[in-house]
Amino acid sequence: MPTLVYNCPSGISGDMNLGAMVALGVDPKALEAELRKLPYEAWHLHFDPDTRGGISGIRCSVHAHDHHGKHSSHGHGHHHRTFTDIQKTVKGSELSDRVKTDAIACFHALAVAEGSVH
């Protein structure tokens, strides 16, 4: 299996990560199908080419639907989940055991890094 190494001295958000994966050739439908294995309801993704500050890439917009079917783009006013919340969600998902293990390890590393700078 190929290994992807990130060098993000300024960090990377989840939507930036999804856009980068699509820009590298990951099929957006396959990506969304895997994410659908998580127990979250009423959302969809949009992937669009974008250029900012002379840097081109794929922008991922995450749209969460409310109970009336309306949607809004992901913004900074959202709820942040703790590592424990994420761990419970991943463990309770329909993802494969290997993906669960890898995802929890990645989020643990992220939690440790975030804890050291905040």
Regions found by a protein language model. Name each.
Residues 1-4:
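Extreme N-terminal starter segment of soluble prokaryotic enzymes
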Residues 6-18:
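Conserved phosphate/anionic-ligand binding catalytic regions in large, soluble enzymes, centered on
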Residues 12, 117-118:
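A short alpha-helix capping/helix-coil boundary motif
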Residues 23-117:
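Glycine-rich nucleotide/cofactor/substrate-binding loop typically near the N-terminus or early
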